[in-house]
Amino acid sequence: MQWVRDQVETYERTGGREAGTLRDTGIPVIIVSMRGAKSGTVRKIALMRVEHDGDYALVASKGGAPDNPDWYYNLVAHPTEVTVQDGPEPFFVRVRLVDGAEYDEWWQRSVAVFTPYAQYKEKTSRRIPLFVATRSTTADAEGAAAKRAR
């Protein structure tokens, strides 16, 4: 979608000073960059900013659609080749799918930030995947890239 590409470009260019909210909602977003599962090309998206103790929730809601967003498969394929930008500079993260009580806690945090998630959950028969992104080191991402190149 062009508006997503425009938002990502503006956010990155201004270090988050502009385009830091979801359209006209005033709700903050983060920029998530990842490697494409099939293409290997870097993909970027803006997601709702759900942060707790330095970790971030990445909610694969796709507006309650019956299928997962494409970026879900990118994160599953390359969980250590991900960056988050929450302000002027991006940083490396590792992502992991959560379940059980941890899922419930992060889901509650996510709905508190963006209440439409609750409607999305009611709208779909799938369990909306939820990743937690935790800060990582450059070495983690470089090691993953080196393994892939072999």
Indicate where each model-derived feature is located.
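Generic C-terminal helix-cap and adjacent flexible tail
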Residues: 136-150
